[in-house]
Amino acid sequence: MSMLCYTLIIAFLIGIWAAPQSEDNVPLGSPATSDLSDTSCAQTHEGLKTSRNTDQRHPAPKKVDDQEPGSVANIIVDPKLFQKRQFQSSRVLFSTQPPPLSRDEQSVEFLNNEDALNRNIQAKRQNHPVHDLGEHSVCDSISEWVTKTTATDIKGNTVTVEVDVNLNNEVYKQYFFETKCRNPNPVPSGCRGIDSRLWNSYCTTTQTFVKALTMEGNQASWRFIRIDTACVCVITKKTDNL
């Protein structure tokens, strides 16, 4: 009888030793706990992969701030920057589309309240009365609204000029009204109406400085840049007549 009891006890102990330990009885830091952590990490990683795949199938719309550099065609400008704008020129204009060159063109949306003044100036430049009176200009010029990506500032440095500006979720372009010579020699002798027997002459484009929105590092700032503004006649006295 005692042998049978010993046999049963030994079999019971062997069974307990051979049975896998339950997770509830595993001490902290044991291999079973490590396996459980690995399992949880694997499940979490699998969940992240599933979520990432779902996001790839249904990508969320990008915000302006989240887009890669170079993928955004315009910069977002603080409206306070325009409140600090000084020395405004009628030759610099922020508009949603190319400004009209004549009074008959359809009106467009301007950034400031000087649209009427700008349109009047444009009309006067386009419809100058001298040709209607039989008068002729010494030099022929052409005027048009243009955009710029680079320019020379007042210090002689090449700077980056902003083309597209995002202000209050509205995209404006920065336009410059430039005037330049159509031809350096409107007549074979140079400038029109100049006595070529006494004078050498030619037409040349002159420039002036206007305040424009430029990029300085990663910030937008106002800076004086040079643009073409007029076509003038340059004359020099012929040396053989001295």
From Swiss-Prot:
Residues in the signal sequence: 1-18
Keywords: Cleavage on pair of basic residues, Disulfide bond, Growth factor, Lipid-binding, Metalloenzyme inhibitor, Metalloprotease inhibitor, Protease inhibitor, Secreted, Signal, Toxin
Chain residue ranges for the region called Disordered: 45-69
SMART domains per the UniProt record, alphabetical: NGF
Propeptide segment residues: 19-125
PROSITE patterns reported for this sequence: NGF_1, NGF_2
Pfam families, per the entry: NGF (PF00243)
Protein name: Venom nerve growth factor 3
Lineage of the species this protein comes from: Eukaryota, Metazoa, Chordata, Craniata, Vertebrata
